[in-house]
Amino acid sequence: MITITFNGAINSDNIDLYQDIFSGEVQNPNGCQIKGSFFVSHKYTNYSAVQELHRRGHELAVFSVTNKDDPEYWTGGSYDDWLAEMAGSRLIIERFANVSDGSVIGIRAPYLRVGGNKQFEMMADQYFVYDSSITAPLSRVPIWPYTLYYRMPHKCHGNAQNCPSRSHPVWEMVINELDRRDDPFYDESQSGCQLVSSCSNIVDPDQFARMLRHNFQRHLDSNRAPLGLHFNAVWLKENKGFKKELIKFIADMLDRNDVYFVTMLQVSIFPVAA
C-alpha cells in the first residue's frame, strides 16, 4: 500500500495539480480509482474545491483552522487550543464543503509538532480516529501504523517534540522517514526526511525518481509497511519535472498489479479487516 497526502489550503493554485495526479483514468488493480488524503487548513481554502475532492472519493482530514506560524504554539497547546483548531476545522469543512457523512476523522499537526497528551485527549473526546503527526526515524525496518493504547514502538523523534506519554484510544498513522541517500550502502551522512519536500538534497527529477523507487523497494523487501509520500503542493507545482516523475511512478507501480494507492483511513481499517 502507498499513501499520497497533501497538507494545507485547497484552492485554484493547486486543484489542477491534484486533478493531474489523481486523474480518473488511473486505477488500482481492483478497478477502483486511486485516492489521496488531504489535510485541510482553513485559511485560503476554497470549499467548492474541497467538496469536489470529497465527491471524487478522496479523504479529507484536518490541518487546523489558523495554521499558526509558531511551532511552540502547537507543542504547548492547551486542550482548548487543540479543540478550537482541529474540531473547529472539522466543523468548517463539514459545513462549507457540505460533508455530512462523518468521514473527517484524521488530524495532522502543522510543522508535525505533536501536542502531547492534551492533543490526544481532545481527539478521543471528539471521536477522531487517527493522528498523522508523529515521525519514526529512518531505520532498517519501517513502522506499521499503531494504536496509542500502548507505548510507541519507536523513540519520540525530533527536537522538542511533545509525544503522548499516556494511553489513548487513537491510531497513529506514523510518518516513516524517507531514505534520501543517493547511495544507501555508503552514504551514511544523510538523515531521513519526513515530507518529500523536506528532502533538500533531491534537486533533479532523476534523483527524485530513484528515491521513490528505492523507498518502495525498502518497504517491500522488509515488512511491507505502507509507504507514505507526504507532499506540499507548492513544492510539486514549482518542480514540474518532479510532478512528471511522480505520475510515472504511480503508473509503474500500478503496472505491477499488486500495489494499491489508498487513503490513510483505508490503511487504518486494513489491520482490522485483515
Model segments located where?
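Alpha-helical scaffold elements lining the catalytic groove of polysaccharide deacetylases
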Residues: 14-16, 67-98, 148-221
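His/Asp/Glu-enriched short active-site or ligand-binding loop at hydrolase and phosphoryl-transfer sites
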Residues: 65-69, 125-150, 175-180, 195, ...
